């Protein structure tokens, strides 16, 4: 990636197009020397050592995101965990990820309401999910078979593409319950706070038979978010310069 300290942006490169750029401008040997030495960054190499301009480099750039305060000129070799992107390099959130989050909220809701199963929950065996969700009895010989899960009645599409203007880099910071924080040499590409992301939710009532409706799912999500916040999030120090409170219900 190329970090522009003046613009506070990070540009991710198309590797093939980048090497084409080097070959076309007879910069391969110079790049080999750059790779052999310690330190340095691609921005300085491309624009100062090679003398390239933005128009020449642009074809090698896949996309560009805001680096905010996650990067600085002295620490430009941080690892970056990139966001999920499709074949056209558009950021999106898989529907399966959202369904997994909703599944957790619904399981929490079921545990709170159906206390007859509480004695079956322990640290070694975990939560007997089949007792709560595997109620369709389509494969009575194997209850753990996913075909029996009532979650089949909930379908969530992948999100619509997220504009790169709504993406940003965030610096990973570990926070302890005693208030101490420790910055890690790692950044993550994230969706900027306040961004609305759209999915299509389908509830197949031929399977659900009224067990879950949109309102009941939203109530379960809100209840689990409150539990998560009270039980865990409030025990830790707020992120530095955070614009949203920890534990906020993002769904």
Q: At which residue positions do the language-model features occur?
A:
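Small/polar/charged residue-enriched interaction surfaces, especially the RNA/DNA-contacting tracks
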Residues: 1-251
